[in-house]
Amino acid sequence: VPRVQKERKMPDFVHLHIHSEFSLLDGANRIKDLPVRAKELGMKAMAITDHGVMYGVIDFYKACKKEGIKPIIGCEVYVASRTRFDKEPQDKKYYHLILLAKNNKGYQNLSKLVSLGFTEGYYYKPRIDLEILEKYHEGIICLSGCLAGSVSQAILNGNIEEAENVAKWHKNVFGEDYYLEIQNNGVKEQVMVNQKIIQIARRLDIPIVATNDAH
């Protein structure tokens, strides 16, 4: 009698990379509509990850609770290419990184990071740097970000070694709370980046998470 192989169930999809109207000049999603749509799609949770700010998290929390959706509080932070104190023309370049609070301590640390982005790192955008990311990482889940993330940017520049070094640094800081992010957004470059990220994830034993950078 042939053995029947048990089908492996995929985890339920949850949006972990979403922008609202508080991602100014960028996000078109209305906070009040997000959990309603998530409920229609049978999702049990969703995150908010506006660019560099947390203005909408209270409204988002209340809207999710109203619809029975678990709210995940996060932010897509801007990471300075050097330090948060460097503010010269070359420092207009920055990277994107997704941070999600997994508990109250994580929410406190995320709030601290976002605040420091404004009070210490502001240069065109509210920027943090690796120093304070390491200092205030407790209770935070970190995703590698979109095509503007430091891992993806290194891949796009043809520097796989640099991409791996970036991933290693974040893994050392966040441990099992660091994930490499892949997306299916119709962008040609994303397909190549996804392939390289999967390879890096296997080599470095880092888990992968699928997101879709919803705006």
Regions found by a protein language model. Give the residues of each.
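Short polybasic linear motifs
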Residues: 1
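Phosphodiester-processing cores and adjacent nucleic acid-binding clamps
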Residues: 4-215
